[in-house]
Each structure stands twice: as C-alpha cells, then as structure tokens.
C-alpha cells in the first residue's frame, strides 16, 4: 500500500499553499497536487525572453489588507514589498480624466455639477449600509441608480460593470459593488490618495517562497498532477487519482473552481450535490501583457468608460513599479473578462494582439506596433465567480458529502471579492478546521 498522508490538498494557489503551510508547520504530513506546471494559481508568474519576471494576471494589494503583509513578514521578505500612492484615471469621451482625489472628482466635467456631487456622496451613502444581505436581492444597476441616478450610472458605472461582467452584467448582485466601494473608501491615506503594494517579481515569487517553507517542514508539492477522480468508501474519501498516481490520505481539501471540483467528484457523489457546485457561474479572463519601448500614459490604473472599448482597463504596471526593474521597458496589462462561449476566447495570440492594438491606437494615437517588444496572452477559464442575486442562498459551503473532505475556493470568499489577501485568510481558516479534526 502506498503511504497515507495526513492531508492531501488539491490546488497550489494561495488558499491551498496557505493551508499546506499552516498544517505542515504543525507537523502534519501534507501533499499538494497541482494540475499546472507552476504554483500560484491565478497569481502565477512567467519570464520574458531575457528573464524579466512578471505576473500572468496583474495583482496588487491595498494598504488595509492584513493577511498578505503578515505572511510576507513571517517568510522574512518585507524587503521585497513596493508601496506607492496609486495613480488612477478614467478614459471617457475621447479624453483622460484623473480620478485619484476628491478634487479630481470635482473637475470631472463629463458630469453636471449636481451629478458630480452625487457621485462624491456615494462613498458616504455606501458606508451607511451595514448589512449586505439587505441589498443582495438587487442588481448593481438597480442599487446604484437608486443612489446616484441614471446619468451617473450610465457614464461612470455601466461601462465598467459591462466590461467586468460581460453577459452577466445584469445578473450580478449589488453586494459586489458595495464591497468594492467600501473597501476602496477605506484604503486612502491621510492625503486622500490611495496606497497600493506590490511584491517584487510578482506574487508568484511569494508562492514559491511558501513552497520552500512547506518543503522545509516535510510537506510535498507535485506539479502536473491533475486529479481525475476520488476513491470513496461509505461517507469517507480514501484516495485521489491522478494520471500517474493514487494518493491516499486521512483528510482532503479541494481549492480549485467549483466546476473542476464537480468533475472530480462526478462518479462518486450524489448528483444533486454535484449539480449545486455547477450552479455557480464563472467568467473567463484573457490578459494581454505588453512589453513596450515607450510609456502609454502616466496613469497606473486607467478605467475605460467607453462602451466600444473591449477591455476593463489599461493597467500600466511600470507607472507603479519602476521601469528600471524591467530593463527600462514599459509593461501594460489589458484585461478582458468574457464567457468562454465568446468568439474572442478562441482568438489566437496574434489575433488577440491585433484586436487590442486597433482599440489602443484609438486611445493613444502615437502608439505604433513597433513599440511592442514582446507580448504574451494568458487565459484563465475560471477567473471570476459570478455572484448573482441571492448568491448566499445557493453557494455551496465547505462541506462535501464525505466527512473527511472539504472545499475552500475563491467563490466562497463572498461577500468579499476574490483576492490573494482573502485566499490567505481562507487557507488559514480551513487549516484550523482540518487540524481540529485530525486531533480528535
């Protein structure tokens, strides 16, 4: 019989790695199985031709996040954190607007003065809501229009919601937006501008530091190990199957997206429960990373409020982390959320770059194809869970039909939205639950 682990964890994103780290630190025998060829999940990194490292999908954290900095400190890597006031802006009606401070808002003449005031007061109205359940039955549009009117919604919010949630724009409940506004309102420093933090070389480096820490304490991590099914007896799981291996364990934790977990359990669990996992919808993301000779603008995070623009925004990473760290080149991310049924999902990398370029040149007329030194296109099928109205009523919890198997995944972080900070929080919480069971 092959050896039995105390805990077998599926997925080496931040939730899986955090749980593995906590448990192996306490002396449990842990094995992590990751389908991909690298750790970090959506926060994984890649290298350009000259070895410059970067994220596949951009991440930063806010100055009110607590779990990431705690972890960074514990791993002794505080020196790798870069913090800067963020420079955010908006592209609307063919021009750029700065939107980093209250004063910028007053200059936003695309809205009437009354509407600017309504937009400015929104943060205060939002803070008055203490119980998110009271707005869970509303769509984002219904809720925001009631607070700041149709014109503000149309100009400022609708293009962002549409580019973020694509075909699900009318389905997502208001809690998602409420959470975003409350959080962003609390991340400002004493001058009223927002502070953001980034990890040198990308969050994937932090994930790799966790791998080293897990291995130091005797834990194991196996890459290219896609779990295909489970072996169960009565109400207990005994083992997981991968293409090469059968892995036995006492406790099991599943951290991928619900549809992936549903496929793994398909033949072993009751259909009603498996279908409940499939009830949660997801959007995919295509992220284009451009390495450029020249800078596009001086804004880090440019929201594009132009109904014809197919990306949620232009994130010029080197307006946050200095170009010196990238051999004096400039890095821009273009992110698009879409249903995987969308024809754009099937574009080749080359088609996607051409598609992006025609839109970028409309915004930045000086930009030329010769600016692009290198590019990469990354695709994530389950990038954003869609939290529809009444989501808390149907989202599956951490339990499975098997007493020794648990789920902790991005779609359960609700009412918060996804993020590395919460992945770490959830990984710690589920590790506690599992440790308590092992100690019985």
Model-derived regions: residue spans:
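Conserved Rossmann-like nucleotide-cofactor binding loop
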Residues: 15, 38, 259
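Mid-domain catalytic core of redox enzymes
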Residues: 2, 26, 225-332, 337-346, ...
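A conserved FAD-binding loop/helix module that cradles the flavin
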Residues: 412-435
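Dinucleotide-binding Rossmann-like beta1-alpha1 core, especially the glycine-rich loop
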Residues: 50-132, 159
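Active-site/ligand-binding neighborhood in enzyme catalytic cores
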Residues: 111, 120-233
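N-terminal Rossmann-like FAD-binding beta1-loop-alpha1 element of flavoenzymes
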Residues: 5-32
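Glycine-rich FAD pyrophosphate-binding loop
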Residues: 24-49
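FAD-binding beta-loop-beta segment adjacent to the flavin cofactor pocket
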Residues: 321-327, 380-407, 411-414
């Amino acid at each position: 019989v092959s050896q039995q682990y105390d805990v077998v964890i599926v997925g080496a994103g931040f939730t899986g790695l955090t749980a593995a780290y906590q448990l192996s630190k306490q002396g449990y025998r842990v094995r992590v199985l990751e389908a991909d060829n690298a750790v970090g999940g959506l926060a994984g990194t890649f290298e350009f031709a000259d070895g410059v490292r970067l994220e596949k999908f951009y991440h930063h954290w806010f100055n009110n996040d607590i779990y990431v900095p705690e972890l960074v400190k514990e791993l002794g890597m505080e020196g790798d954190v870069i913090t800067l006031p963020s420079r955010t802006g908006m592209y609307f009606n063919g021009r750029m607007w700065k939107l980093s401070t209250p004063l910028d808002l007053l200059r936003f003449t695309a809205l009437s003065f009354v509407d600017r005031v309504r937009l400015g007061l929104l943060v205060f109205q939002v803070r008055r809501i203490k119980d998110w359940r009271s707005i869970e039955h509303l769509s984002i549009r219904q809720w925001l229009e009631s607070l700041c009117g149709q014109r503000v919604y149309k100009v400022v919010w609708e293009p962002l919601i549409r580019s973020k949630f694509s075909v699900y724009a009318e389905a997502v409940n208001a809690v998602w937006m409420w959470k975003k506004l409350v959080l962003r309102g609390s991340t400002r420093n004493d001058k009223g501008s927002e502070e953001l933090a980034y990890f040198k070389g990308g969050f994937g480096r932090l994930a790799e530091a966790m791998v080293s820490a897990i291995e130091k304490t005797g834990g194991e991590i196996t890459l290219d190990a896609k779990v295909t099914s489970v072996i169960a007896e009565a109400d207990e799981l005994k083992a997981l199957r991968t293409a090469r291996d059968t892995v036995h364990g006492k406790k099991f934790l599943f951290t991928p997206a619900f549809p992936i977990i549903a496929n793994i359990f398909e033949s072993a669990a009751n259909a009603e429960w498996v279908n409940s996992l499939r009830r949660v919808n997801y959007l995919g993301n295509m992220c284009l990373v451009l390495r450029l000779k020249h800078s596009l603008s001086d804004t880090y995070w440019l929201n594009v409020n132009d109904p014809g623009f197919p990306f949620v925004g232009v994130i010029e990473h080197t307006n946050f982390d200095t170009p010196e760290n990238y051999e004096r080149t400039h890095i821009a991310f273009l992110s698009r959320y879409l249903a995987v049924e969308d024809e754009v999902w099937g574009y080749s990398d080359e088609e996607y770059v051409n598609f992006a370029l025609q839109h970028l040149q409309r915004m930045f007329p000086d930009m030329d194809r010769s600016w692009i030194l290198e590019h990469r296109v990354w695709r994530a099928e389950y990038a954003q869970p869609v939290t529809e109205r009444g989501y808390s009523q149907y989202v599956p919890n951490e339990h499975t039909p098997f007493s020794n198997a648990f789920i902790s995944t991005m779609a359960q972080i609700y009412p918060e939205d996804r993020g590395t900070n919460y992945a770490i929080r959830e990984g710690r919480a589920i590790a506690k639950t599992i440790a308590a069971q092992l100690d019985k």
